[in-house]
Amino acid sequence: MRAYREPMDRPEVTLANYDAVYDFYRDHQQPRAIARLAYAMLAARYRPRVNYRAGARDAVREMIATGTPVVIVANHLTHSDQYTLAATAWRSPLRTLIGRTRVLAKDELFREPRQRREVDMMGGIPVFRAKNHGVRAVADAGRRMMDVAALRLSRGDALAIFPEGTCNTGDPAQVQAVGSGIGHIVRRAAALGVQPALVTVGIAYGPDNDPGRPASVFITLPVPELAGSPREVTQRVAEELQCAVDGAVARY
């Protein structure tokens, strides 16, 4: 993927610098034309086979056309999943959201300059994970991240999340525990006056979990409004994600 030039005032992505980091990503906008080109290239390279629950393709298209903010969730199996998801976006009605989708991504992806440019171009927002920095250390940064994610939804952006938080090294057909962060983001977005919809994407790379082969991808019927407490939202997301994974595995 060809890199593009970002503004020179990008803050260093470190936990100690999280306030400046989230001030930057609160308003950061990638060039949409370049993002579309990159997603098209990823679609040509990764070639996911995209299938849908009956009626889901039209339902997703119609929902996006209403301008409803969308939360896109996918299961996490390998370090190639973000590229598979980007390729899926290009090959589905999600294409219209390219260039205005924020993607929550672990902070390690923002360290190397070239990789950071690519992640920024794809709409990345850094996440400082407790498994890397400790629960107490990331608490304040986590709250800022959720505030920024909710604000972007309230402005009409979509938000893409791998809510399991880490690669599934166990049974790829079984969704891991879903973190409560997605529930808190949705609750914060509701406080800002928007009720996001949910689009769920299941990914399967076959029995060997080999990302070198085209993935089976399955998109379920969208949930028009994510509502309830953070815990209730998180539970609904987990249920929808397992249904999507079941569909992807069955169609591999």
Model-identified regions with their sequence ranges:
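Short, basic, glycine/proline-bearing loop/turn elements
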Residues: 128-136
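Membrane-anchoring hydrophobic helices of lipid-metabolizing enzymes
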Residues: 1-91, 98, 111, 120-123, ...
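A general structural motif
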Residues: 67-69, 98-100, 156, 193-195
